[in-house]
Amino acid sequence: MRWAIGCGLFAGALALATPVMAQDARMTVTATPAEPSAIPLNTGGVKGQAAPEAWFSQYGVAMTRNVTTATLTPFLPDPAKATGAAVIVAPGGGFLMLSMENEGWRVAKALADRGIAAFVLKYRLKPTPADMGGFERSVTAMFAGAAQPQRRMSPDEAIAGLGDQIADARAAVAMVRARATEWKIDPARVGMVGFSAGAMTTMATTLAAPDTHLAFIAPIYGSMEAVSVPADAPPLFAVLAANDPLFANKGFGLIESWQKAGKPVEFHLYQAGGHGFGLGKTGTTSTGWFEDFMHWLDANGMLVRR
């Protein structure tokens, strides 16, 4: 598997994991929100992490960092509309923070509105300084490092670096299947959608833990590098903007890998949208990806009530 997940990519994803729009880019500390529906996944903590989980606002959306306890938050559809399909939603944030609102809750609510049980995965993150000033300084330092040539990680290094995230994703899938009857879910129709770093988590789970048997995967503005496709790889739906500053203009190896392996694949390259657009950047065709995704799920038999 040829897949670059380096320090520079972490920094870039961190900078761009929130929507690029004319809003306040300052990081403002906020109170930790109540998460009464969040279910601990019991996957352990984070080695060397002493700082508590912290929440803040940037670009007008809720973010969190220093996550040491992975959780899964259900967004269940109206039983009258439920299709039986389920999706694990993995937000992005460069593995240093999570864009919970833009790439988590909003997406999950949109899925539930369409009859799909959605589950926002708050996965464990890399440690950052406890105080916001220290966090901002560490981000600045990382940006400076990202400007320098980066060593390409080996496949084993890349997967090893995402061990916590893969474990959290596997636990999330296992929990959804274990409670399928309670949540009125077809265990054979559990897929995963991930944004940026969440897309990398989705792909890493698919490649390193094929025993999760995901029914489908949707990496949204994730890496397009070629991979070694598992024999039982699930159907893939991928989205990217042509002006994505991280992943555009680097070829479409991921798509070609799925094609060459003879696996179902659909790819949407939108003219504009940048990176971190969530459900879509207003004024661009990237706002159409969610409907395209719904159509693709339906065409692949994922939304048929059984």
Residue ranges and their predicted role:
Residues A17-P19:
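N-terminal signal peptide c-region/cleavage motif recognized by signal peptidases
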Residues A62, E136, Q259, P264-R306:
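C-terminal catalytic histidine-bearing segment of alpha/beta-hydrolase fold enzymes
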Residues A38, G45-T71, D78-V87, G92-W183, ...:
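Serine-hydrolase catalytic machinery in alpha/beta-hydrolase-like enzymes
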Residues A238-L240:
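Short beta-strand/loop motif that positions the catalytic acidic residue
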Residues M1-L9:
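Bacterial N-terminal signal peptides that target proteins for export
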Residues A90, I220, Y270-G273:
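Alpha/beta-hydrolase
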Residues G163-A233:
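Primarily recognizes the serine-hydrolase "nucleophile elbow" in alpha/beta-hydrolase
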